[in-house]
């Protein structure tokens, strides 16, 4: 059965559903890497600028959208900036388990299936819950790569279901992804 559209899961309804020990069949997190580019602290010391992709609204982002955004931004930065010239971190983790009450949809169905109201549903995916002002992506880089970093974050933002903004600032002293 195909995945439901993201609009079905974009809004936050109810408390987070995260306790895997009580959830049978909870899907695994399908994001292989959260840190890309140069990850060593010694090499990152040369980066003087920080760009952040910040959420503007409260909402949920499915792990497929996070992975698509991570891949497109990482590939763009690797192609135009080079692996040694940036550090990219995905700052949110999809802990919330999404549920789906599957309904039958058959060819030639002349009557709609109604089903039980407020049914609990079975695990169908995962999502990260974000609040306004929360950092989704964090990039450290040198000032000469500013245009490429902003373009990479713009492309990543196009994959996400909630509005975001890009914040660029000088790197703080000893602070990591906040």
Swiss-Prot record:
Which Pfam families is this protein grouped with?
Answer: Ribosomal_L16
Superkingdom: Archaea
Q: Does the keyword Ribonucleoprotein apply?
A: yes
One GO term of the biological process aspect: translation
Q: Which GO terms describe its molecular function?
A: structural constituent of ribosome
Q: Where are the membrane-spanning stretches? A: none
What UniProt keywords are attached to this protein's entry? Answer: Ribonucleoprotein, Ribosomal protein
SUPFAM superfamilies per UniProt: Ribosomal protein L16p/L10e
Q: Name one GO cellular component term.
A: ribonucleoprotein complex
So what family is this one in?
Answer: Belongs to the universal ribosomal protein uL16 family.
Which PANTHER family has this protein been placed in?
Answer: 60S RIBOSOMAL PROTEIN L10
Q: Could you identify this protein by its name? A: Large ribosomal subunit protein uL16
